[in-house]
C-alpha cells in the first residue's frame, strides 16, 4: 500500500514552503521551466540570498537518469533555500552508495525504501507492499549506520519485467505468472545484483516458482533496453518508472506482477544524522516538501523526458520545481 502524506502533513509542508518563499529575495530574473508532468503551471519561487550556516551538502547520484533527476531536484531546491549543495556521481549499486556515506563523501541521496531495507538486512525478504511497515523495519538499521530516512514520497520505482510486443504475442505472456508457465527457457537481462535481489531472481523463485538463474545475463541498466530490442535477451528488468514505458513507440510489454512479489520501493531522501542534526527543520522542510509533491506518474514522465526526449537532468528538475512552486535553479 502506497503511503500518502496525511492532510495535516501536507498543510504543514505547504505552509512551510510559503514561509520559504516569503523569505526569498527580490530577483525578478528567475524564470519557470517549460513544464513538467501534472503541474499546476506555477512559477518557481525566488531564491533567498541568505546562506545557511553549516556543513556543505554532498548529494550522491547513482549512474541512471532517475537518480540524476532526483539529485538535481534536491540540489536546486536546497541551493535556492540558501544551502551550499552539490552533486557527486556514484556507481550504480547500493554498496557504493553506503560506502560513500561511510567515507563522508556524501551526506544525502535519493533512495528507495524496500530496496534499502533488503540491502541492509541481507535480502531477508522483510519488505512488504506497505511503505509504513517497511519503513519501520528500515529505520533501526539506518540508525545503526548513522543515517536517517526522511519522509518518503508517493512515487514508487521498483523492478519491472518487460518483454517485446513480439515475444508477448508469440508466447501469450502478459503477466509474471504467464512468464512462469511459458517462459522458463527465456533469457533474463538485469543488473548484476538481480541474483541476490529479493525482487528479482530470488523473488521469481519464491513467489512464482520460476528459476531463470541459469539463463541470466548480468547487464548495466543502461544497456538493457538495447539488448532487449536487439534480441540479445528475451526479458529485461528496468525501473517501473522507466520513461520508455510511457512511450507507445517503445514496443515493450510490462509484465503484470499478478501475485504481488514487488514491495514498497517509494522514493525517499536518505541523509546522515550529522546533516539533519546540523540543520534540523530548515533542511527537512525542503526535502519532505519535495516528497509530498512527487508522484509515480510524474516520475515516469520526468524519466521519459530524460531517456526518450533526451533533455538534461538539470533542466528537467528546474521545470518540475517551478511547476510545484518550489524554488530551483
Protein language model regions, located:
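Sec-dependent bacterial lipoprotein signal peptides
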Residues: 1-21
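A ligand-binding cleft/hinge motif common to bilobed small-molecule-binding domains
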Residues: 113-125, 134-138, 227-254
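Bilobed "Venus flytrap"/periplasmic-binding protein-like clamshell domains
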Residues: 54-91, 153-225, 230, 297, ...
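A bilobed periplasmic-binding-protein/Venus flytrap-type ligand-binding module shared by bacterial periplasmic
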Residues: 159-169, 265-279
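Acidic helix-start/capping segments at beta-turn-to-alpha-helix junctions
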Residues: 88-106, 113-118
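Short, low-complexity, disordered segments immediately C-terminal to signal peptides
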Residues: 14-15, 25-49, 53
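A structural signal for short loop-to-beta-strand junctions that line the ligand-binding cleft
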Residues: 127, 138-160, 259
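An extracytoplasmic/periplasmic, membrane-proximal ligand-sensing/linker region
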Residues: 54-56, 66, 207, 282-329
